[in-house]
């Protein structure tokens, strides 16, 4: 069991002692499981394979099952499931047969939030980074929040932590509309873009309305923090019948950034807030998109009474999030080194933001990009946008689409993407079949001073550490151990 257990504050959950997670290794599940372990609940969970995540939970006292079997859930008081799990799962089927409650992941998160000062971060892009920045700034302000994040907060070494204060900071997931379960006191909407459209029957208006409904889960005394630079957020703003504060680069925003300057991994800017002195801040992340994420954090921190000194400290001391422009280290090539970066971006808007950040922070360097599209349906729906943004790399290697459980869709694969990008005449992309060792393919393409970006939400996440440890890159230096 985790040390420093906190007493359980959820009166309605006193009868619940044994909580079972189906798919406990998932990024949205493991954090909630860890918080519940810290609260003193008996936690078990199943997954298809062991991982560092399941091993960590097991070390904290969770009972982990590899594989899904009916008997795994036999003694549970409640089952927690993600949207990827359906009633054909034997554990879910057993629970339903025995009248054991089966609740969505977001409903369990909402239960944790019920008796706390909830801060929920929603939006198509930037949720994980903004949530992580909030956790960092709140900690710098001495508030010790509980947080549940969709990525590993590097400073904490985890994506979830039970704090001692009344604050709970969490991501609000719109992909399956489950964020409608949450009832926070403060909510952020970073942006609204076309993604996960199957959830919304392909109707963008339905997606927009769902975000408005989410904000109306706030109490009448709550606060909606909204990015005025995003055209769709700006469009729904008049429909929101809750107190609001806006942020962005726009002169109309309540909290805005000026004098933005990027220097490699660091971004410097000045924050203007109504009736406050200008505040000079820096954050250890490149790109204007991370300035916006920082502004959302500053809005909430200011509203909660966190001092400017703590805001500056929390932002400048932020150590980043796993797979969000994560610098792995330096790869040796003839004449020098190549900076190796890993990133989770899997939507054209995210890809474009990262490319822009690279151009802004390292304008003299070439960008060599290994990209893996995520889902055939997303590739089909956003095909032209992918063609446009991926063509902006200097060198592009396209891995085959990571299916994420989907069947192939004709014309929505990486081979076709390569063809369409090639027709633009900007560069000649290289198609990579699944299972190919990339190190021998990548090395001849690299020059000293290049930035090698591995990007996507699928199993490409394992590529950067493989390259760092490849014999072809003997002498590679991991980040934090002398990397340039």
UniProtKB/Swiss-Prot annotation:
Superkingdom assignment: Bacteria
EC numbers on record: 6.3.2.8
Disulphide-bridged cysteine pairs: none
Subcellular location(s) of the protein: Cytoplasm
Pathway(s) the chain acts in: Cell wall biogenesis; peptidoglycan biosynthesis
UniProt entry tagged with the keyword Ion transport: no
Residue ranges of coiled coil: none
GO CC list: cytoplasm
GO molecular function annotation: ATP binding; UDP-N-acetylmuramate-L-alanine ligase activity
Reaction catalysed by this enzyme: UDP-N-acetyl-alpha-D-muramate + L-alanine + ATP = UDP-N-acetyl-alpha-D-muramoyl-L-alanine + ADP + phosphate + H(+)
UniProt xrefs under InterPro entries: Mur-like_cat_sf, Mur_ligase_C, Mur_ligase_C_dom_sf, Mur_ligase_cen, Mur_ligase_N, MurCDEF_pg_biosynth, UDP-N-AcMur_Ala_ligase_MurC
UniProt cross-references to HAMAP family, sorted A to Z: MurC
Function: Cell wall formation.
Family from the record: Belongs to the MurCDEF family.
Name of the molecule in the record: UDP-N-acetylmuramate--L-alanine ligase
Upper taxonomic lineage: Bacteria, Pseudomonadati, Pseudomonadota, Gammaproteobacteria, Pseudomonadales
Gene: murC
């Amino acid at each position: 069991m985790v040390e420093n257990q906190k007493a359980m504050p959820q009166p309605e959950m006193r009868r619940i002692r044994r909580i079972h997670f189906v798919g406990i290794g998932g990024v949205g599940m493991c954090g909630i499981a860890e918080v519940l372990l810290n609260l003193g609940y008996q936690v078990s969970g199943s997954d298809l394979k062991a991982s560092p995540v399941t091993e960590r939970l097991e070390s904290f006292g969770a009972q982990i099952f590899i594989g899904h079997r009916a008997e795994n859930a036999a003694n549970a008081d409640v089952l927690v499931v993600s949207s990827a799990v359906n009633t054909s799962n034997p554990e879910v089927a057993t629970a339903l047969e025995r009248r054991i409650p089966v609740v969505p992941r977001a409903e369990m998160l909402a239960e944790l939030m019920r008796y706390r000062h909830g801060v929920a971060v929603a939006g198509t892009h930037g949720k994980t980074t903004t949530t992580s920045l909030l956790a960092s700034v709140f900690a710098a302000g001495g508030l010790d929040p509980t947080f549940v994040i969709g990525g590993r907060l590097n400073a904490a070494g985890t994506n979830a932590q039970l704090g001692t204060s009344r604050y709970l900071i969490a991501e609000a997931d719109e992909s399956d509309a489950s964020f409608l379960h949450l009832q926070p006191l403060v909510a952020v909407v970073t942006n609204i873009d076309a993604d996960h459209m199957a959830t919304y029957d392909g109707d963008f208006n339905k997606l927009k309305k769902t975000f408005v409904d989410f904000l109306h889960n706030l109490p009448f005394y709550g606060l909606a923090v909204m990015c005025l630079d995003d055209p769709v957020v700006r469009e729904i703003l008049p429909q929101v019948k809750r107190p609001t504060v806006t942020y962005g680069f726009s002169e109309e925003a309540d909290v805005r950034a000026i004098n933005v300057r990027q220097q490699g991994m660091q971004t410097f800017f000045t924050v203007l807030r109504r009736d406050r002195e200008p505040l000079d801040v820096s954050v250890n992340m490149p790109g204007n998109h991370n300035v916006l994420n920082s502004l959302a954090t500053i809005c909430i921190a200011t509203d909660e009474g966190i001092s400017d000194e703590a805001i500056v400290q929390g932002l400048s001391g932020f150590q980043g999030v796993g797979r969000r422009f994560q610098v792995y280290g330096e790869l040796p090539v003839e004449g020098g080194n190549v900076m190796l970066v890993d990133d989770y971006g899997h939507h054209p808007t995210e890809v474009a933001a990262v490319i822009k950040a690279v151009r802004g922070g390292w304008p003299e360097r070439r960008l060599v990009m290994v990209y893996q599209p995520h889902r055939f349906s997303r590739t089909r729906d956003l095909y032209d946008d992918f063609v446009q943004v991926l063509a902006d790399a200097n060198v592009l290697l396209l891995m085959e689409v990571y299916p994420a459980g989907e069947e192939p869709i004709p014309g929505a694969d990486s081979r076709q993407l390569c063809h369409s990008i090639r027709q633009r005449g900007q560069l000649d992309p290289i198609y990579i079949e699944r299972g190919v060792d990339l190190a021998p393919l990548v090395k001849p393409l690299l020059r000293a001073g290049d930035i090698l970006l591995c990007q996507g939400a699928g199993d490409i996440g394992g590529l950067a550490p493989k390259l760092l440890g490849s014999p072809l890159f003997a002498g590679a230096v991991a980040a934090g151990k002398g990397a340039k």
